[in-house]
Amino acid sequence: MKDEIDENNINDRSTIKDGQGKKLHSNTSKAVALLVLLGVCGYLAYSTLITNKKQPVELPKEAIIKQTERFRPAQPKPVLLEPTEKNNLLLPKVELPTPKRNQTNADDSLLEAAQRAPVLAYASPQKSQANAEKNNDTSPNQLERKPDETAQRFNHLLKPTNLEGIHASTLTNRNYIIAMGASIPCILETAISSDQQGFTSCIVSRDILSDNGRVVLLDKGTQIVGEYRSGLKKGQNRLFVLWNRAKTPSGVIITLASPATDALGRSGVDGDVDNHWFERIGSALLVSIVRDATNYARNRLPKDQDKNSSDTISSGPNIANIVVENYANIPPTLTKNQGEMVNVFVARDLDFSSVYKLKVIEDKKQIVNRSISRNFYKNSAVILK
């Protein structure tokens, strides 16, 4: 028993000694690594100190600009003539010739220098001549006088506004003219529907007289043809109609190019307006019903149902939304039945002088007799007082 205990103690001591030896070995390795690191750092510091020493600074060499061509004296300026006196304005101007000195050599050297130059500048000869003439005409005192900005503004304020006058004129012959602004009552011959653009026509319900009320220019029964465009906007309840041409029973035609109005002169034609509420509300109800049906079907399906059936159910609301978008943008429709009354607002003076001619149907004696009795109507028993 004692021998076993002694062997155990000896084994424990040997393990303790082995652990202490390992610790000493690790400490020595750490010390060696630290010394190596310090040596590397010292070497780097020493190398940086050597490189940071002041190096001799080389000054840039000064560029010396030398003259490659000979010096040329400036050409003499042309002598300007002194302004003549007021009494000698009619005398012709005499230009003195300027002396020319070796112009050929100077021109050749300038031409060679211009060809060697990287950039060439050109000047318009006409502008330069005009500027030279202006400079010769103006005196140095005038060049020194520059207008002040305040003076220019004041002069601009003193200028009045140019107003063009408008002259009054008269109509050539009022017996042949239907003046602008007249109203022509007309009965629709065809019905109107704003779903599609198209043409329409109407019949004049009474005789239309001239501007002075003496001559019938458009007989009763005249046919007027016009056109209208499709597509009313939401909230509108009037349709614009443009009357193009009128044709009398005798075959006289004239271009109107005038708009249609109602009895009170309001632009456009009124009528029965259909806003298509049933289609719009029906599409909204369709969407709600389809959504409820798809939700109910989705809840009724088992969780392990096939994917194709779920895709079919989910595509229902998308189709309903597309239908709603198409029906929600339906424009309102205006309809006006045939036989209803409309008016034509004359937008320009209508001249019938090229197709109608007037002639006297009573002699002077008959006219005088009717004027004495104050009966201005032919074959009438009514006496006007």
Curated annotation (Swiss-Prot):
Keywords, alphabetical: Cell inner membrane, Cell membrane, Membrane, Transmembrane, Transmembrane helix, Transport, Virulence
Answer yes or no on keyword Transport: yes
Q: Please, which domain of life does this record's source organism belong to?
A: Bacteria
Instruction: Name the segments for region: Disordered.
Output: 1-23, 123-145
Matching NCBIfam families, A to Z? T4SS_VirB10
The entry's function note states: Component of the type IV secretion system VirB/VirD4 which could be a major virulence determinant for subversion of human endothelial cell (HEC) function.
Q: What is this protein called?
A: Type IV secretion system protein virB10
Gene this chain is encoded by = virB10
